[in-house]
Amino acid sequence: MPYQIRKFIFSIFSLQNPRSLYMNAESKNNIVIFDVATSNDKSIAKTQQFYLSKATADNTRRTYQAAIRQFEAAGGLLPATEQDLILYITAKAPVLNPRTLSLHLTAISHWHCYQQLPDPTQTIQIRKLLKGIFRSHGKPKRKAKALHPEHIEKMVTYLQQQNNLKALRDNALIQLAYFGAFRRSELIAITVEHLRFETQGLLVLVPMSKTDQEGEGKTKALPYGNNNICPVQAVKLWLEAANIKQGFIFRAINRWNNLQPEPLNLNSVNKIIKTLANKCGFDFVADLSSHSLRRGFATSAANVGTDFEWIKRQGGWKNDATVREYIEEGQLFDKNAAAKLITFAFNNKE
């Protein structure tokens, strides 16, 4: 919307609440709103809007939308002023994690950016206030617990003892996610068309990912395993039992054990892992998520001497620091200066 028109509309609503204008229509539910070029061909405008919306990842958009809704629920208005934000983050500091508040500010910043309005989040006052909140209320980032080979084996063994469609699906999902080090968004997007079975194993095309937003694509290879642990056979058995010939491979199953056409959603993957871990008797269910498989792969692969670059390539990580963090956490006792000192400086004494 051109500045002159926006200014005119603001003047019309000046006796009410001019800042409510932006959140009365489509932008209330969509964090990314753009001006679509006027065109006599409505299909062109619609297509343009579609492409513009794809400039932001779906997960990011949903996260920002949720943040905007929370800001509104607390009485916040858009466009926001510096004072609005000061009041908001000061009031929420005792109850929200500082990282959550920082994310809310990022969402609000993006909203103003896309509306071509001044960004109120970038003032010195806001930055200093947020820094003070982090210093006062900062907490260690909660991390998903890594699942190791012994956990995977126990989960797979349990599933193989069940005789139903869900167990076959979950077995394929757990093994593929673990040995492929897939993100859950990648996992639920896999289709039959992305799979290619070879004599050495299974090739899985990942057409787009968190670190490949422009869709260059990446292929992951999963080798055959043994009779109990084999991601390739697990996927084959699932596809045959579910008679899936095309489309998404990981789909919802209703309470009558009937396969549904739609794929699993992101929350379903976490629920499957937690439910299975609970049935296996794990005492750390609350610390698990889909990321436990991906983190566990990196940690466990490093523990058996796998080359760093191999681990990084399989997981599709671009940031070396992230992979090293996973690996180092899994080797806290193995590569431990205190352990070395105790062993050689004290245990050798008679």
Which stretches of residues belong to each language-model region?
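Extended, non-catalytic subsegments within catalytic or DNA/protein-binding/adaptor domains
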Residues: 3-350
